[in-house]
Curated annotation (Swiss-Prot):
It is an enzyme of class 4 (lyase). Keywords: Amino-acid biosynthesis, Aromatic amino acid biosynthesis, Lyase, Tryptophan biosynthesis. This is Tryptophan synthase alpha chain. Tetramer of two alpha and two beta chains. It holds the Pfam family Trp_syntA. InterPro entries: Aldolase_TIM, RibuloseP-bd_barrel, Trp_synthase_alpha_AS, Trp_synthase_suA. Its EC number is 4.2.1.20. The lineage of its organism: Bacteria, Pseudomonadati, Pseudomonadota, Gammaproteobacteria, Enterobacterales. Pathway: Amino-acid biosynthesis; L-tryptophan biosynthesis; L-tryptophan from chorismate: step 5/5. It catalyses: (1S,2R)-1-C-(indol-3-yl)glycerol 3-phosphate + L-serine = D-glyceraldehyde 3-phosphate + L-tryptophan + H2O. The alpha subunit is responsible for the aldol cleavage of indoleglycerol phosphate to indole and glyceraldehyde 3-phosphate.
Length: 268
C-alpha cells in the first residue's frame, strides 16, 4: 500500500500525474507477458494494473476478453499468475502493482488466503470489479489485514453517500470511471469529471486515477487537468498486443511508442 503513497508524493514533487497501463497476465503467453510488463515500465509506466484471466469478465469489452482467451489458450492459471507477480516484484521493487479481478477468483482461494498470497508476492492493491462497496466488507477487511489496498470504482453518477463510502473504505487510489459501460478504447472517455474529483478530495479519498476509454495523450492530459492524479489505459494497450500477436519484437516496440507520449502527457 505504501508504494502508492510514495509514488503519488514523488509525482507531486515533480508536478506529474501517473500513467498506469493495464494488461492481462499471461497474454499472449507467460514469457512474452513478462517482456511486455518490463517494456511498459521502461517506457514510463508509473504503476501497473494487471488482470488475472477469468472465464466470465463482466466489465470487460471485447478487447480485454480476447486477451483473457489468449492467456487461457496459453494454459495460464491463477497459480502461474502469482508466480509471475513474484518475478515482477523481484525485478521492480518500488513500482505499485494492482490487480483488477473478479470475486470468483478470490472465493476460489478463500478470501483471506487470496489476500495473504497477494501480500506474499508484493501486490499493493486489489480491485474486485463485481463487488459493490456495500458488499465489500469481507474483501476490504481481509485486504487491510494483509496490507493490501482495497480499490473502489467511483462511477460518473455517484451520489454523495457513495462518494463518502468510497473515500472511507478505499486505500491506494480511487478508480474514477470516465463513463458507464464496458471497457474499450473505441468508447472515448467523455467529460472531465471535475465535480467528482472535487468531492472525493473534500472527503479525503485516495487519489483518483481515471480509467475506461483512455487511449490518447490528450485524454491523459484532460484527466489530470480535471484534477485526477493520473490515468489508466487498458484496451488501447491490449489492442497493440493483439495487432502484433505474431511479431513479438515489433509488439514491444509498438508498446513503447504508445506509452512514451502517454507518460509525457502527465507532465505539466
Amino acid at each position: 500500500m505504501e508504494r502508492y503513497e510514495s509514488l503519488f508524493a514523488q509525482l507531486k514533487e515533480r508536478k506529474e500525474g501517473a500513467f498506469v497501463p493495464f494488461v492481462t497476465l499471461g497474454d499472449p503467453g507467460i514469457e512474452q507477458s513478462l517482456k511486455i510488463i518490463d517494456t511498459l515500465i521502461e517506457a514510463g509506466a508509473d504503476a501497473l494494473e494487471l488482470g488475472i484471466p477469468f472465464s466470465d469478465p463482466l466489465a470487460d469489452g471485447p478487447t480485454i476478453q480476447n486477451a483473457t482467451l489468449r492467456a487461457f489458450a496459453a494454459g495460464v492459471t491463477p497459480a502461474q499468475c502469482f508466480e509471475m507477480l513474484a518475478l515482477i516484484r523481484q525485478k521492480h521493487p518500488t513500482i505499485p502493482i494492482g490487480l483488477l479481478m473478479y470475486a470468483n477468483l478470490v472465493f476460489n482461494k478463500g478470501i483471506d488466503e487470496f489476500y495473504a498470497q497477494c501480500e506474499k508476492v508484493g501486490v499493493d492493491s486489489v480491485l474486485v470489479a463485481d463487488v459493490p462497496v456495500e458488499e465489500s466488507a469481507p474483501f476490504r477487511q481481509a485486504a487491510l489485514r494483509h496490507n493490501v489496498a482495497p480499490i473502489f470504482i467511483c462511477p460518473p453518477n455517484a451520489d454523495d453517500d457513495l462518494l463518502r463510502q468510497i473515500a472511507s473504505y478505499g486505500r491506494g487510489y480511487t478508480y474514477l470511471l470516465s463513463r458507464a459501460g464496458v471497457t474499450g478504447a473505441e468508447n472515448r472517455a467523455a467529460l472531465p469529471l471535475n465535480h467528482l474529483v472535487a468531492k472525493l478530495k473534500e472527503y479525503n479519498a485516495a487519489p483518483p486515477l481515471q480509467g475506461f476509454g483512455i487511449s490518447a495523450p490528450d485524454q491523459v492530459k484532460a484527466a489530470i487537468d480535471a484534477g485526477a492524479a493520473g490515468a489508466i489505459s487498458g484496451s488501447a494497450i491490449v489492442k497493440i498486443i493483439e495487432q502484433h500477436i505474431n511479431e513479438p519484437e515489433k509488439m514491444l516496440v509498438a508498446l513503447k511508442v504508445f506509452v512514451q507520449p502517454m507518460k509525457a502527457a502527465t507532465r505539466s
